[in-house]
């Protein structure tokens, strides 16, 4: 839904119909214009963060140029900003962001992330397993604020 202040709230449910027992990620993909070169986030960084691997990451505001080694990978987030000197937007999302150097204009806003295997072992049962055979949909959401709204916050 779009509020009178221009805030876009996105909510989704995904009910899987696949032949695999688990899925690696659940979320949505956002493609931006190439001119929005800066990417910043409040969350864990600068290293990758997964539900079962957060020890090397530190809570803070992180960022750099989209597609650079400073911002690529899997990041646990509270908000994400794409901008340049003239305009931008903020995504409010209590989840994860995946960003790849090969497609700097694309961000994956994720509500669920499968625990990362370590040394050949799968994540233990304390990490959400994201099973596809339960009949329960994956639910997520986020909000987008335009640059003008950021200056008021």
Q: Where do the PLM segments sit?
A:
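Beta-strand/loop-rich accessory regions of lumenal/periplasmic or secreted enzymes
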Residues: 1-153
């Amino acid at each position: 839904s779009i509020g009178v202040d221009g805030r876009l709230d996105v909510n989704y449910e995904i009910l899987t119909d696949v032949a695999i027992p688990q899925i690696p990620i659940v979320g949505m993909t956002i493609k931006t214009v190439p001119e929005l070169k800066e990417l910043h986030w409040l969350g864990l960084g600068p290293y990758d963060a997964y539900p079962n691997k957060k020890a090397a990451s530190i809570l803070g505001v992180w960022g750099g140029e989209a597609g650079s080694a400073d911002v690529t990978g899997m990041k646990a987030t509270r908000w994400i900003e794409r901008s340049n000197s003239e305009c931008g937007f903020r995504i409010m999302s209590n989840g994860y962001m995946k960003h790849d150097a090969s497609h700097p204009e694309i961000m994956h806003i994720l509500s669920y992330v499968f625990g990362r295997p370590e040394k050949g072992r799968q994540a233990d049962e304390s990490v959400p397993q994201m099973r596809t055979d339960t009949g329960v949909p994956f639910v997520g959401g986020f909000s987008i604020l335009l640059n003008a709204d950021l200056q008021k916050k």
